[in-house]
Amino acid sequence: PPLTSCGVQRSESLSAFLEAVPLDVVYSTDYKRTQSTAEPTARAQGLSIQSYSTQALEEMAEQLVRHGQDALVVGHSNTTGVLAGLLVGEEIGSFDESIYNRVYQVVISKNDKRLHVFHTAFDCAGR
């Protein structure tokens, strides 16, 4: 199904949140909702959305590390935490599918891997 009007507002808030972050690539699964969530950020940064499979998270993590790009990866409640964990070498599970305000930032440098979790205020107007 498409994003709700609230989901559209959140996707635009995500784009604004990342406005000052120059991204190299935007990844999303092939689901309509994740594509629609990624679209405002990709458009604002002049990027096309690259697809990835949730069935190959280890490969995705390896690709992200190998390419060393600043990337936005839009995923799902049962895969996003897992992918973040793979990137930093920690076991992180899924989160409740009703949570829409969580942004994981993974910072990988030569000697360190860090995970920051932002609990954003991506609330909907009129709620």
Stretch-by-stretch model annotation:
Residues P1-G68, T80-L87, E91-R127:
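Active-site-proximal alpha-helix that buttresses catalytic centers in soluble enzyme cores
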